[in-house]
A protein has these predicted regions:
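Membrane-interface starts of transmembrane alpha-helices
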Residues: 61-74, 132-137, 201-204, 246-247, ...
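Membrane-helix interface and discontinuous TM-entry motifs in multi-pass inner-membrane proteins
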Residues: 5, 9, 80-86, 90, ...
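Hydrophobic alpha-helical transmembrane segments of membrane transport and translocation systems
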Residues: 286, 290-385
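Alpha-helical transmembrane segments and their immediate interhelical loop/hinge regions
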Residues: 160-276, 280-282, 295
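Anchoring transmembrane alpha helix of integral membrane proteins
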Residues: 1-95, 99, 355-385
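Hydrophobic transmembrane alpha-helices
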Residues: 41-48, 178, 254-260, 264, ...
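Hydrophobic alpha-helical transmembrane segments of multipass membrane transporters and ion channels
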Residues: 16-24, 40, 74-82, 153, ...
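Short, amphipathic, aromatic/basic-enriched membrane-interface segments that mark the entry/exit
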Residues: 2-14, 142-145, 220, 240-243, ...
Length: 385
């Protein structure tokens, strides 16, 4: 009889726990936009943490600068860096729209007609399955037509105002929340600790501290990597490929942003950068680019992006992934493979931060489990006990 009572009590306990989790999940889903703003603000505050720490050391004749002013300067610095990326990319788009005219397109078509014909002949010769009438440009056009749904443009234009309005609200919300997270770095910890039982509060504080240290270093490293990759690509495109300075800057920073996506991001950025470089060379009203033939110029562009990626793999990524979040390359590779298989390429952007959070939680709350204690030793955490 007693066993039945205990079993019933345990069952009721688990049912209440499941109901509580379902309720919390439902609330999170209802307010997913608000949660997204908060999480983005947390990321911004983590990126801004080193800047804030540096500013706090500044004394003017023994007088400390007010904390709110330091937070405002830090936030403006981060927003300035993000705005710089956007401002540098916009001229590239505007220059392409301005310089590429119908006449230039016809001239570009004549310039690449012979190389494209040779490529089609090569493909038909070595890949007979493609058929005698295969043309690469036609195949690409058909695939693009499948992706682009022309009938959906009317609804897209109709919802543009709503999208802009929502985007504006989102930007304001993130900036507002980020300011308070930067100003009071313990605010997020207090919010989370208020939701956990008293017996878990100390462990939760340590876990949040560890997560904050690791993710701050990671996001700072990723930001440095973006600018490092952009700098190398800019120098290559400007000095070697001889593209204009504005075009080189725009393409370089675009490839730096794409580089955030592990593994396939550099390929996407390099491919798009090569295409944009070719468009600028052969469709621009003003002559740009090294005076070589089509294939040589294409090879130069590819070589620039490959060299940058080589430096990134040898220098930047080991410092960011291995040093900043204290994980081995094998761990990172397996995590990215799993997440990429489940959620696709874009989900790989958040794979490492999520893995870092889960790793710290596992150690702090389940460190007594043998498998976890062996796989995640204590020296892999930054915070001191």
């Amino acid at each position: 009889m007693e066993n039945n009572v205990r079993y019933t009590e345990k069952l009721a306990k688990y049912m209440l726990l499941a109901a509580g989790i379902a309720l919390i999940g439902g609330i999170c889903w209802m307010f997913k936009s608000v949660l997204a703003y908060i999480l983005i603000a947390v990321v911004v505050s983590l990126i801004a943490k080193p800047i804030m720490s540096g500013l706090q050391k500044i004394n003017i004749k023994g007088i400390r600068i007010p904390h709110w002013l330091l937070a405002a300067v830090t936030l403006l610095t981060v927003l300035g860096l993000l705005s710089t990326l956007i401002i540098l990319i916009i001229p590239l788009i505007s220059s392409i729209v301005k310089d590429v005219s119908v006449t230039n397109i016809e001239s570009a078509a004549k310039s690449i007609a012979v190389p494209l014909s040779d490529l089609n002949t090569y493909l038909r010769t070595y890949f007979p399955a493609l058929g005698s009438g295969f043309r690469l440009e036609v195949a690409i056009g058909e695939e693009v037509q499948k992706i682009v749904n022309i009938s959906g443009f009317s609804s897209l234009i109709g919802s543009a105002a709503s999208l802009i309005s929502s985007f504006g609200v989102g930007i304001f919300s993130v900036v507002f929340i980020s300011f308070f997270f930067i100003k009071d770095d313990g605010l997020f910890t207090d919010i989370i600790c208020a939701l956990v039982p008293d017996r878990l509060e100390q462990t939760t504080e340590k876990a949040i501290s560890d997560i904050g240290h690791l993710l701050s270093r990671y996001f700072t490293g990723v930001t440095i990597e973006i600018f490092g990759v952009a700098l190398l690509n800019f120098l290559g495109l400007w000095l070697v490929a001889r593209l204009g300075i504005n075009a080189a800057l725009g393409i370089a920073f675009m490839t730096g942003i794409f580089n955030v996506i592990p593994y396939i991001g550099p390929l996407m950025g390099g491919a798009l950068g090569t295409i944009l470089g070719l468009i600028l060379k052969y469709s621009s009203a003003v002559p740009v680019g090294l005076d070589v033939n089509f294939w040589a110029f294409t090879a130069i562009l590819i070589a620039v992006f490959c060299f940058t990626q080589l430096i990134d793999n040898i220098l930047y990524q080991p410092l960011i992934y291995s040093t900043s979040i204290k994980s081995t390359p094998l761990e990172i590779f397996i995590v990215l493979l799993v997440v990429g298989h489940i959620g696709g390429a874009l989900s790989m952007i958040i794979a490492i931060p999520i893995y870092t959070v889960l790793r710290v939680i596992a150690f702090r709350f389940f460190g007594h489990v043998k498998a976890i204690s062996r796989l995640i030793p204590s020296e892999k955490l930054i915070s001191k006990e």
